């Protein structure tokens, strides 16, 4: 895509937006229903595309992507009328007599750039919010998941209003051509490195952004818990969650020296229960997305500070781009595997003398997108929530805060900015416009020249909401 082509796409959408077409409730509903049809009429095609890109199991394709998009569409359709209604607010003495409300206004023409790890979900989920809010949208799917990208382009062109919603496929040149345009908002999901490029491009036009990035998400495992349940839940979003290629996947575990051997045994047992003795042959595990990421992952294992810390797994199959679930015990904190986001099927376990030492370790790294704690101790839960700064926290499970549409999902610090899901998606793509209405009555002479001391006292009382002070000023009493 050339600069001219990108300008043409944006100009066309800008004309559609100015026409007011996308602002109506009816248009928004029609487009949300179109997205819903894609999930119900073309689910098998989506499964096949995800299998082609990631060897994603059918179960994960439905649970982690198709059902999530379907539920987000249904929720938006159910709640949209309420979301669009102006929000009444009380007014103060300073504006009496008046009424006031907050009106949700679409931003205009927005750009959604998506990631490859959940290429169907991460494309359509933010789009649902953008459409519900009444915007025109350009979707740039990830070229690293080409089958899903091509399918999205085909289905969206078939189902949605292409005068208001466009798909632009391609790689770096196409993305840069898009970033050079003036947008009313950019929503990006992906790596921090590319996030910096997006933010820099947006700054040229003072364009607001939502950045959904990542980080090293810690999982703290306390003693005296049900280790079998904890192990199963950790596995469910580490290895059963796209082979660890998930931004909120557990990146490393912190537990006590005494608890570590028992935890390792519990995870080993459940891994073999899920994937058998030879997990590389299991059809229930996704592959690594491409050879570059595969080499990065095996390179982490080849680090001298890591290679002798493998207590389970470590095998790989380059021909199928698969790496077995791998547990690393007591790796050095200055090792490569503890210095960067893993984003794969390797799970380091850090041991400490006391569980409270976890806070120092977590605080030594950039703020993560998510953090997890397994414990039966209510006080420890309160301490964890208070002491750990993260995009979101789940206690005694993994990633479930992501599934709750009434919770905002987003990062903090280097793990991202802004949030979405449910009404938070609608709000992310809306401007909250303040509207105050008055009649021609209720004139206050103290507002206007010529100024006098009593007028100053009168205005002070009004602005402070001081009825007694107002009366004193009216009667000319000095304070």
From Swiss-Prot:
Site entry: Transition state stabilizer: 117
Gene Ontology MF terms: aldehyde dehydrogenase (NAD+) activity
Catalytic residues of the enzyme: 212 (proton acceptor), 247 (nucleophile)
Gene Ontology terms: cellular component: amyloplast; chloroplast
GO biological process, one term: aldehyde metabolic process
Induction field: By abscisic acid (ABA) and dehydration.
Top enzyme class: oxidoreductase
List of residues binding NAD(+): 190-195
Chief location of this protein within or outside the cell: plastid
Subcellular location: Plastid, Amyloplast; Plastid, Chloroplast
Top-level lineage group: Eukaryota
InterPro entries registered for this protein in UniProt: Ald_DH/histidinol_DH, Ald_DH_C, Ald_DH_N, Aldehyde_DH_dom, Aldehyde_DH_NAD(P)
The entry's keywords: Amyloplast, Chloroplast, NAD, Oxidoreductase, Plastid, Stress response
SUPFAM superfamilies found in the cross-reference section: ALDH-like
Enzyme Commission number(s): 1.2.1.3
Pfam hit, one: Aldedh
Biological role: Oxidizes nonanal, propionaldehyde and acetaldehyde in vitro, in the following decreasing order of reactivity: nonanal, propionaldehyde, acetaldehyde.
Family: Belongs to the aldehyde dehydrogenase family.
Protein name: Aldehyde dehydrogenase
Gene, per the UniProt record: ALDH
